[in-house]
Amino acid sequence: MQKKWLLGVVFLVVTVMLAACSESAEGEETGSDDVIDIVWYPNESGNDLKTARDAIGDQIAEATGKEVEHHLTTDYAIAIETIVNNNADVAFMGAQGYIEASDQNDAIQPIVVSTGPSGTLDDAMYHSWLAVKVEDQDDFKVDGEFSLDTLEDTRFSFVSNSSTSGFVVPSSTIIGHFADKDLTEEDLMEGGPLFSQVLFGGSHQGSAVNLLNDSADVAAFCDSCVNNYVEVAEGEENTVGSVYRVKDDAAEPFNTVTGSEFMLMSVTPVLNAPFVANMDALGQEDYDLIQEVFASDEMANNEDIFVPEDSDASGLFSKSDQERFVPVEDEWFNPIRELSQN
């Protein structure tokens, strides 16, 4: 009788524990914990952008009533894996990174993107650059004009093969230009098929520094990720032939190449990067609250987030007119999706 009683107690305890574990797991899946984890790419993980990250985190914390933690990374793949594997609720990532993440986990959904000066998606874009050192410009010209023909047998630096503007867009352009070679993206990831050597900077800043410290002859990187460190020295912004100079007080990693100059040999518009959510980790309620606060006037008018264009402060986004965040659907990223499938 006593044995039966003990077995009954053990069974009851185990049942309660299993139920508690089940409820805990269910709570985790629906995003019911009290912390929202935001994972950032290496480009946005630097100390110089802490104020901007914290400002966004503060807005999310106020909207949801939850603590916000920032997950900083040094590698694109780590950031993507973190959001895919339910170890983060929100991520700021390029279009290609979002596409890769959503392909691996259909719970990944876009929240918002930043607009262009119009305040709409019509001009929500930044720019992918191919840059060379000013003193080497003639090596990349044919009849006085920059030509992609000159890229053959050069040392080339990309950002990461998961980077939209630092790999997918420029590689598509290069593959199209050298159509007779039947190149693939994989061919551009190593020396031999086209380039003599291929480097990956790990971030847009890192790719630019590869050029400026003479590790590479040509580098791909984007305007928005280096704007805090460089200034136009000659010409106009985002124009082929314009010269940019690294600021004297530039933060890491540009502090080792201050005063260096580079010239743009190619400029290509790219769709703006989204903030995305893992719906299994975050949950619909918090998703709706976060999307609402991102799209609010309060967020749009926060100068720590949208830094006025005449300010010397470092920021993630700049404000020249009506820039703000707006909700976006998955279909908006199809042009980038099509590039990566070609």
Predicted stretch roles:
Residues 30-47, 66-72, 155-157:
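Short, well-ordered beta-strand elements
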Residues 22-24:
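Bacterial signal peptide processing site
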